[in-house]
């Protein structure tokens, strides 16, 4: 059993949770999220707290599902209350980004601009042409979209050029010995 799943999920002020047959709906000041539930876990709402327990009739995989659904519901509560944000930075000569309508337009050192469609539930903004901010309610969707941006030009280990997460450490490699003057 997950140790975190033993603790209740406390609901902040302004967040409402409703548990229907096979759905969990979390509403808050930033919006609402829905998650489908499974029969392996029992989710109960008591005194402004959510409890996630393994169902007593299931012996196959109860503990892993308990931890999974605890984390999913906890992320939903945090998402509708505060939201999630991933920031990326572009490092390289001529690298820049801009938001044009429903597309993120990237100039990343190829002959054509790269256009990435922005999901409707996310807000993407660009600061200083090289800092990209992805915001949204759903932690998984924010992370997936930020990872898809980073995958267009991951940072390379020699000069560090590419798209990286803010404060990400890129392990650098030494160049050829001939260039550094070593024998």
From Swiss-Prot:
Q: Which PROSITE patterns match?
A: RIBOSOMAL_L6_1
Which GO molecular function entries does the Swiss-Prot or TrEMBL record give? rRNA binding; structural constituent of ribosome
Domain of life, per UniProt, equals Bacteria
Q: Name one Pfam family in it.
A: Ribosomal_L6
Q: Tell me if tRNA-binding is a UniProt keyword of this record.
A: no
Regarding protein family, the annotation reads:
Belongs to the universal ribosomal protein uL6 family.
Subunit organization: Part of the 50S ribosomal subunit.
Protein name per Swiss-Prot or TrEMBL: Large ribosomal subunit protein uL6
Query: What organism is listed for this UniProt entry?
Result: Chlamydia pneumoniae
Q: State the taxonomy lineage.
A: Bacteria, Pseudomonadati, Chlamydiota, Chlamydiia, Chlamydiales
């Amino acid at each position: 059993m997950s140790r975190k799943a033993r603790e209740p999920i406390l609901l902040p002020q302004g967040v409402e949770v409703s548990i229907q047959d096979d759905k969990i709906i979390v509403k808050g000041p930033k919006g609402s999220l829905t998650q489908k539930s499974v029969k392996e876990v029992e989710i109960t709402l008591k005194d402004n707290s959510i409890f996630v327990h393994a169902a007593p009739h299931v012996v196959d995989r109860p503990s892993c599902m308990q931890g999974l659904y605890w984390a999913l519901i906890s992320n939903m509560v945090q998402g509708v209350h505060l939201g999630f944000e991933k920031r990326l930075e572009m490092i390289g000569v001529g690298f820049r980004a801009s938001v044009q309508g429903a597309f993120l337009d990237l100039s990343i050192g190829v002959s054509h601009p790269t256009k990435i469609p922005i999901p409707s539930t996310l807000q993407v903004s660009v600061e200083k042409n090289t800092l990209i901010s992805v915001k949204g309610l759903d932690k998984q969707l924010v992370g997936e979209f930020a990872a898809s941006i980073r995958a267009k030009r991951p940072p390379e280990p020699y000069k560090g050029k590419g798209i990286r997460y803010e404060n990400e450490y890129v392990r650098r490699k030494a160049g050829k010995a001939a260039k550094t003057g070593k024998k």
